[in-house]
C-alpha cells in the first residue's frame, strides 16, 4: 500500500520533515516515491508547504495519508477530517481531456493519409564509411559494425556487447569506425 507520510530531516532536537509518497513497508527515512512538500514545526510560524495537485493525485489513486498528514492536508483544505478529498481536481485538467476526445472523434471521421513507402536504402552517416540504421533498425548490406554515439564505442560481431547494443550508426570497417573517433570497448580514450 502507498502512504503519504512524513520523512524526518534536520538535526538532533531540531526536526524538520518532508512530506513524501512511500511504500507502507519502507522505513521512516528510507526509500520513497516522490516528495510533495515539507513541514517545519520548529519555525515560528510553522512552515507547511504541500503541492496540492500532487496530494490530490495520490489521494485519488488510493494513497493513505498518515494521521499527521491528514491534519496538515485538512488545514490546507485538501481533505476533510476523515481524510476524504474535498471537491474535485482543478477544471484545468478536464479541458484538455475534452479537447482530446473531440480530436479523437474528428480523427476517426477524417480520411487517413497513406504513409510514404519506406526507403530500402540507409541514410549516410556523418562519418565516412558509416550509415544510419534502416527503418526497422537492421543493418544495411555490407555494414556489420555497430556504433554507439553516446559512448563513442564500436562493437564488432561476436564481441561481448554486440547483441545488446542498439546501433546508432553502422560502420563498414573497424578502420572507418576508429577514423570517426569511435573506440573498442575496454580501451582507454586517447585523452
From Swiss-Prot:
A single GO BP annotation from the record?
translation
Q: Which HAMAP family match?
A: Ribosomal_bS16
Q: Name one GO molecular function term.
A: structural constituent of ribosome
Q: Which organism is it from?
A: Herpetosiphon aurantiacus (strain ATCC 23779 / DSM 785 / 114-95)
Q: Name one GO cellular component term.
A: small ribosomal subunit
Q: What keywords are assigned to this protein?
A: Ribonucleoprotein, Ribosomal protein
Show the SUPFAM superfamilies listed in the entry.
Answer: Ribosomal protein S16
> Family per UniProt?
Belongs to the bacterial ribosomal protein bS16 family.
**What Pfam families does the database record attribute to this sequence?**
Ribosomal_S16
What gene name is given for the protein in this entry? rpsP
Q: InterPro entries annotated for this entry?
A: Ribosomal_bS16, Ribosomal_bS16_dom_sf
User: Per its record, how is this protein called by name?
Assistant: Small ribosomal subunit protein bS16
Question: Gene3D superfamilies, alphabetically?
Answer: 3.30.1320.10
